Regions:
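Conserved alpha-helical "signature site"
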Residues: 1-207
Length: 207
């Protein structure tokens, strides 16, 4: 899948109005994506009580939001000329943003996950962030967070990137009583397991 086709697929998956039937139709168009999704759903990462044999089964068992999340990840992971570590970095950021949102009682945890994940989309697509975002149906809140660290999601993303760089004076978005080290370690552990299921290399140990 070339970059244009991949971006078009991701844009379809990220539409706010995507429903159960839409998602099944989008995924079923790509045999490789369908196969990889079913293989991943049946992996040890999910440890489901029974084998999933169809896309509809996957949707029923995991729910629309989860299937959309993992299908988007697979589409992003399909680039053959990018290091796996780049996707793993996106997974770590996504999970840490989500964990911070969860700790602060934010309702839109999926939006925080998406913000963290797509913070690497410019590197994955070899183009500027603003150009990529023109093709994606994101809310202005997520666009502002990715471009300028605006709003609550932007502040959380900025804190995650600051921790990544070792700039520990810029962690103001972390909830009181939370340990950045602990949250990052949880994110790395999750990303390691998830990337293994997606066929990526394991994440490096947290420093």
């Amino acid at each position: 899948m070339n970059d244009i086709a991949r971006l078009q697929l991701v844009a379809e998956l990220q539409r706010a109005d995507v429903d159960f039937d839409d998602l099944q139709e989008i995924v079923s168009r790509d045999v490789g994506l369908s196969y990889n999704l079913l293989r991943f759903v049946n992996s040890a990462f999910f440890s489901l009580p029974r084998r999933v044999e169809s896309l509809r089964d996957a949707l029923v068992l995991l729910g629309l939001s989860n299937v959309r999340r993992w299908t988007t990840l697979m589409a992003l992971a399909s680039s053959q000329d990018k290091p796996h570590e780049l996707l793993v970095t996106g997974l770590i950021r996504a999970r840490m943003c989500e964990l911070i949102a969860q700790a602060t009682g934010e309702r839109d945890k999926e939006g925080y996950f998406t913000t963290g994940l797509f913070s690497v989309i410019d590197a994955l697509m070899d183009t500027s962030m603003i150009e990529v975002l023109r093709s994606l149906p994101f809310s202005q809140e997520i666009i502002g967070a990715l471009l300028n660290y605006d709003g609550p999601k932007g502040r959380v993303l900025h804190a995650v990137l600051s921790y990544e760089r070792g700039d520990f004076d810029e962690l103001g978005a972390l909830p009181a009583g939370s340990s950045a080290v602990e949250l990052y370690a949880q994110a790395v552990e999750w990303a390691t397991q998830a990337s293994g299921g997606l066929g990526a290399e394991p994440a490096a140990d947290a420093a």
